[in-house]
Amino acid sequence: MIKNTKKSQKNKILTLEDVSISYGTFEAVRNVFCNFKSGDITSLIGPSGCGKSTVLRALNRMNDLIPNCSLRGTVLFDGTNIYDKRVDPVEVRRRIGMVFQQPNPFPKSIYENIAFGARINGFVGDMDELVESSLRKAAVWSECKDKLNDSGYSLSGGQQQRLCIARTIAIEPEIILMDEPCSALDPISTLKIEETMHELKKNYTIIIVTHNMQQALRVSDMTAFFNAVEYEEGDGGKVGYLAEFDSTKKIFSSPKEKTTQEYISGKFG
């Protein structure tokens, strides 16, 4: 079981040690070493097929749900290998929450979208207070407070995504993973999500996959650039790898790798 050190979150770190991920015989990502610091927003960027979403899903064992997906190496959270057989993956996903690319509210009321997960995770406090505080943290309370009994589907796309963020917050995670959370949203909704992320950073560590370079520059403290190279066997397949990891300021102003510069300047993608 992962030890609970919520009160000392600033000391937390999520570490990947020589992580390689495969789908059957296809190796998607190879030899990733990376540290995610507590309290940071970290962006994972890179061209399609470089494995950044695969790596993101590995951080809370969502890849376990994909047939024939396997991981070599170690993923440490609070010093515990989350892939140890003694670790409950459901507990991992509670402590490290996920917001997906497409808004996916439950087919329930707005209120129950928040309350349902908290209830099955054993919450015994004031549910009304939890619902309100979660919706406030996700910056959607003012738009929902008068229609909590309406379906989550009645909200706009941007509101639905913030509802999903609130739903994640309600089960009290310590890290929030976001897989291109704004890709299906309009610019105004995207701005609201980004503003929400800046507020959430005060209490949560956030790791986000994005194809939007300006978004990475606006929201993140650290940026990891993933790229892909052809297999040594020369069969035309490619494997992803972590090409560069540094502060967002350095990645976008003075990257060490030529490929990083070429990617952020739009020469490939």
Swiss-Prot record:
GO terms for cellular component: plasma membrane. It is found in: Cell inner membrane. It is a peripheral membrane protein. One of its GO terms (molecular function) is ATP hydrolysis activity. SMART domains: AAA. The keyword Nucleotide-binding applies. This is Phosphate import ATP-binding protein PstB. The lineage of its organism: Bacteria, Bacillati, Cyanobacteriota, Cyanophyceae, Synechococcales. The gene is pstB.
